[in-house]
Amino acid sequence: MQILLANPRGFCAGVDRAITIVERALEIFEPPIYVRHEVVHNKYVVSKLREAGAVFVEELHEVPDDQIVIFSAHGVSQAVRQEAKDRGLRVFDATCPLVTKVHMEVTRASRKGHECILIGHAGHPEVEGTMGQYNNDEGGIYLVESPEDVAKLEVKDPGNLHYMSQTTLSVDDTADVIDALRQKFPDINGPRKDDICYATQNRQDAVRELASDADVMLVVGARNSSNSNRLRELSEKMGTPAYLIDDASCIDKAWLEGHEKVAVTAGASAPEVLVKEVIAKLQEWGGKTAVELSGREENITFSIPPELRPHPVG
């Protein structure tokens, strides 16, 4: 059995930054450090941070007064920011800078009274945070997930429309929705480049390359991870069966029966240690040395807040 490794895979710069912010806050200020929502969507990561003293909550009312709170990589609404400010909570913001970029697009449109259409998945925390940047009763913000949603959509002023998207969507599906928007609203404005982040794009490109050669695909990632789910869907769309797994213990040996080439990738919030455990399990079952495909190099990094940066010694 051959093991093919996607490249790139796993942690992106935004996830790295978010985890580092929590780790540094724990080191400097000591537990408990409160985090609104899972800082990234991965059970292993959240469990490790919880063991170190992070307390994960869903709403700010769960955070005691005079405490530190960290906003997750997915971002929060203006209302949540205002609530934290009103309560005097000390905030460290782990929102991915690429999500913040989308927030700024919405804020600019809102100030002008223009309407916004967000392409995204209902209920995802990133979508809730982005929708929550809009604050103008004269306009409006609408959520669509598919061309069918676009067909049913009615807006106030088709001449003053902007679209933006969740950063972790399927590249292909988003292109279909944008095409539908442009067809229905010819004057709609959008970002020069779509809002899907570089890491989402790169990991989907790697799966596209792998799926054409593999018999089955294992995607390391959490059920609530948007970008991990898109990797599984893309593989299946290309005709290669794919399974989303939290870790090696989730692999069913029956999935591999009759297959010579097993591909392994990981979502942007899945650590490499979980990938290594998957490879070890496959090798226990007769897998050969894993072969990593050549892929796009990623050298993007995002800085953490100044108060959390290590101070030079001497």
Curated annotation (Swiss-Prot):
Membrane-spanning intervals of the chain: none
Annotated isopentenyl diphosphate binding sites: 41, 74, 124, 225-227, 269
Pfam families named in the record: LYTB
Listed cofactors: [4Fe-4S] cluster
Catalytic reaction equation(s): isopentenyl diphosphate + 2 oxidized [2Fe-2S]-[ferredoxin] + H2O = (2E)-4-hydroxy-3-methylbut-2-enyl diphosphate + 2 reduced [2Fe-2S]-[ferredoxin] + 2 H(+); dimethylallyl diphosphate + 2 oxidized [2Fe-2S]-[ferredoxin] + H2O = (2E)-4-hydroxy-3-methylbut-2-enyl diphosphate + 2 reduced [2Fe-2S]-[ferredoxin] + 2 H(+)
Co-factor binding details: Binds 1 [4Fe-4S] cluster per subunit.
Keyword vocabulary terms for this entry: 4Fe-4S, Iron, Iron-sulfur, Isoprene biosynthesis, Metal-binding, Oxidoreductase
EC number: 1.17.7.4
CDD domains, per the entry: lytB_ispH (cd13944)
Disulphide-bridged cysteine pairs: none
Active site residues according to the UniProt entry: 126
Pathway assigned to this chain's UniProt record: Isoprenoid biosynthesis; dimethylallyl diphosphate biosynthesis; dimethylallyl diphosphate from (2E)-4-hydroxy-3-methylbutenyl diphosphate: step 1/1; Isoprenoid biosynthesis; isopentenyl diphosphate biosynthesis via DXP pathway; isopentenyl diphosphate from 1-deoxy-D-xylulose 5-phosphate: step 6/6
Stored InterPro entries: LytB/IspH
Enzyme class, UniProt record, top EC level: oxidoreductase
Positions of dimethylallyl diphosphate binding: 41, 74, 124, 225-227, 269
Annotated binding of [4Fe-4S] cluster, by residue: 12, 96, 197
Any single GO BP term: terpenoid biosynthetic process
Gene3D superfamilies: 3.40.50.11270, 4-hydroxy-3-methylbut-2-enyl diphosphate reductase, catalytic domain
The UniProt record lists the keyword Oxidoreductase: yes
KW Hydrolase (keyword) present: no
Family: Belongs to the IspH family.
Protein task: Catalyzes the conversion of 1-hydroxy-2-methyl-2-(E)-butenyl 4-diphosphate (HMBPP) into a mixture of isopentenyl diphosphate (IPP) and dimethylallyl diphosphate (DMAPP). Acts in the terminal step of the DOXP/MEP pathway for isoprenoid precursor biosynthesis.
NCBIfam families assigned: ispH_lytB (TIGR00216), PRK01045.1-2 (NF002188), PRK01045.1-4 (NF002190)
Protein name: 4-hydroxy-3-methylbut-2-enyl diphosphate reductase
